Amino acid sequence: MRTSQYLLSTLKETPADAEVISHQLMLRAGMIRKLASGLYTWLPTGVRVLKKVENIVREEMNNAGAIEVSMPVVQPADLWQESGRWEQYGPELLRFVDRGERPFVLGPTHEEVITDLIRNELSSYKQLPLNFYQIQTKFRDEVRPRFGVMRSREFLMKDAYSFHTSQESLQETYDAMYAAYSKIFSRMGLDFRAVQADTGSIGGSASHEFQVLAQSGEDDVVFSDTSDYAANIELAEAIAPKEPRAAATQEMTLVDTPNAKTIAELVEQFNLPIEKTVKTLLVKAVEGSSFPLVALLVRGDHELNEVKAEKLPQVASPLTFATEEEIRAVVNAGPGSLGPVNMPIPVVIDRTVAAMSDFAAGANIDGKHYFGINWDRDVATPEIADIRNVVAGDPSPDGQGTLLIKRGIEVGHIFQLGTKYSEALKASVQGEDGRNQILTMGCYGIGVTRVVAAAIEQNYDERGIVWPDAIAPFQVAILPMNMHKSFRVQELAEKLYSELRAQGIEVLLDDRKERPGVMFADMELIGIPHTIVLGDRNLDNDDIEYKYRRNGEKQLIKTGDIVEYLVKQIKG
């Protein structure tokens, strides 16, 4: 490709609305342009990267035995009503009616569509197992699209769905998809972790996320410093303290705390160790309960894990925090003065709180706290559960080492769905015993557009993108200095361009009438891994300057050796 016949579209300045580095660099490198909130046009450079990612995904899915299909973006509403997700999905599901007043949705995912297909196409257990995938556009009407293509409304996704007559068969495909995903992200040159995860709104019994480690990530990824244990923070178990609860050394005292409405204010004003404080959060109880609210207690320096809390049988789903008005109607005190003593509603405490003694908490009286609270002396020990987020330094749940926490960007997710959708849509086949058998399902997703952004978040420097070789838009950039004034430079540039292309190497020849500084800046911004610079001065010595983008190292290579050298660098 020649720049004179290509839409380069690089920008010198960073657009003001681009927050994360991937969004900034994708705009500056001429990969994308914003059309509307959460909607982007992909320019030629972006499409080249996107296709590289797609091809790797497609190759590994095919290698794992999956079969490619293509399903409509537009889906009839009755399928979503049949599965029960019409109400569950909420406003992210874009709903509309056609000219015949028939309701439809823009598909954010395709469980319903593929299950409908299978229930009409398969009849016997002999046709299974099968695993279908597609690489196709999805739409989710995000309330706050942000971070460019990282959280856009329209995006490209690889989604796969497998069908089985046994859990053993599902596990085999699940393991194959786990291995395929690991190969996909390894081939792309990404630093990632596969972590245990919550199944969320899609449902199911088992789940793993594939997280690319990056400071800008929205998720906390938890892993052991000595073992293979890894989990999303939503799922990571917080182990109960091994040490027995210390004996009480203080009497419980009612203390006036009119200006301490938060744990931070309480700690600062009364010089308390934060580890000796407890915060109380009130959430709505499950429908039909004899109490409207449930009190959840965690240590002052810990955070409530909302996913764990929502799974408590007495807590309403989705988890909903009580308003001040609702709290006062039950406790007759404000949110900053709540605690376990004389709490008139059910209480659930975290494992760490259960091990505390001589602690401080609200007195359920405005402007007052109890200091020196002890379980079983001042208040009966209530129900104990794991309801907090783990923190760095906690023991690993597998008993090996301690936990580390890093930020991650979720780029892939695999689920064992079980029979959730096949039961709802009555997808069954004739089993080996001749009776109808409901199918067991798995689903496996990769955010193709998100992978591109995640790769940049992990691979950049002050000059621009530093692409892993496997997904770079071009492999080699040829920069001929003053080629329009030097016949020798022009002739060699054309010769090398032809020879490299003949070797199957993707080349960008910068044949613009631009200053060298502009040419260098653009190629580094775009992130092409290998650059060769042709100039009269070096050619006097039969030399060509070679530069590797990742480490910035330069070296002179003889003109006659440069093609062989590049082929070796790229193809090994």
UniProtKB/Swiss-Prot annotation:
The protein's Enzyme Commission number: 6.1.1.15
Catalysed reaction equations from the record: tRNA(Pro) + L-proline + ATP = L-prolyl-tRNA(Pro) + AMP + diphosphate
Enzyme class (EC, first level): ligase
Matching InterPro entries: aa-tRNA-synt_IIb, aa-tRNA-synth_II, aa-tRNA-synth_II/BPL/LPL, Anticodon-bd, Anticodon-bd_dom_sf, Pro-tRNA-ligase_IIa, Pro-tRNA-synth_IIa_bac-type, Pro-tRNA-Synthase_IIa_type1
GO cellular component terms listed in the entry, alphabetical order: cytosol
Keyword annotations: Aminoacyl-tRNA synthetase, ATP-binding, Cytoplasm, Ligase, Nucleotide-binding, Protein biosynthesis
Classification via Gene3D superfamilies: Anticodon-binding domain, Bira Bifunctional Protein, Domain 2, YbaK/aminoacyl-tRNA synthetase-associated domain
One GO process term, biological-process aspect: prolyl-tRNA aminoacylation
An annotated Gene Ontology molecular function: aminoacyl-tRNA deacylase activity
Location within or outside the cell: Cytoplasm
Main localization of the protein described in the UniProt heading: cytoplasm
Subunit structure: Homodimer.
Family label: Belongs to the class-II aminoacyl-tRNA synthetase family. ProS type 1 subfamily.
Function in brief: Catalyzes the attachment of proline to tRNA(Pro) in a two-step reaction: proline is first activated by ATP to form Pro-AMP and then transferred to the acceptor end of tRNA(Pro). As ProRS can inadvertently accommodate and process non-cognate amino acids such as alanine and cysteine, to avoid such errors it has two additional distinct editing activities against alanine. One activity is designated as 'pretransfer' editing and involves the tRNA(Pro)-independent hydrolysis of activated Ala-AMP.
Domain notes: Consists of three domains: the N-terminal catalytic domain, the editing domain and the C-terminal anticodon-binding domain.
Name of the protein in question: Proline--tRNA ligase
